[in-house]
């Protein structure tokens, strides 16, 4: 269902395309204007835009969190008014961001890629914030599949989830 929302078939209607562009530009505008002093107000505004375009909102939010590491702890706790479908879209975008990573380890073979580690931090903070509402079965299935394929880097995601959500 979510991949249909990302398809170009939905943008054939000119009115819908106009409002999608308007929402996209507004989301970008409010993300650019967010700083440490107005996070609550901007989060509230962005949640309203998330009702209309949740996939674009979460893709943009994950990109911002991969770029600015302090954005995760500032922004995630303020997303309290999300609907269940928006929370589900957030999990879909997290899985998409984790799968879309071509390199998880730096070229030296030892260090984690900064974007991948920040995606892991975002995922664990997101699951902790919405622990009672989020369905993590697909995330656990992703971790299981990656571990069966021999990708042990994903065990760090499992470690972060256990340590943040379960407080172990």
What is each residue range found by the language model?
Residues 1-168:
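Eukaryotic alpha-helical solenoid repeat scaffolds
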């Amino acid at each position: 269902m979510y991949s249909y929302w990302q398809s170009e078939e939905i943008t054939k209607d000119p009115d819908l395309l106009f409002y999608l562009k308007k929402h996209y530009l507004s989301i970008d505008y409010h993300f650019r204007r967010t700083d440490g002093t107005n996070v609550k107000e901007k989060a509230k505004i962005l949640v309203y835009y998330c009702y209309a375009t949740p996939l674009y909102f979460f893709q943009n939010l994950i990109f911002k969190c991969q770029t600015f590491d302090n954005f995760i702890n500032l922004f995630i706790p303020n997303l309290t008014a999300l609907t269940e479908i928006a929370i589900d879209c957030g999990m879909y975008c997290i899985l998409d961001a984790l799968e879309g990573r071509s390199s998880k380890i730096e070229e030296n073979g030892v260090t984690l890629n900064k974007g991948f580690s920040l995606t892991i931090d975002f995922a664990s903070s997101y699951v902790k914030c919405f622990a009672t509402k989020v369905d993590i079965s697909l995330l656990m299935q992703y971790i299981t599949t990656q571990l069966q394929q021999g990708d042990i880097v994903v065990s760090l995601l499992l470690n972060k989830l256990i340590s943040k959500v379960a407080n172990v």
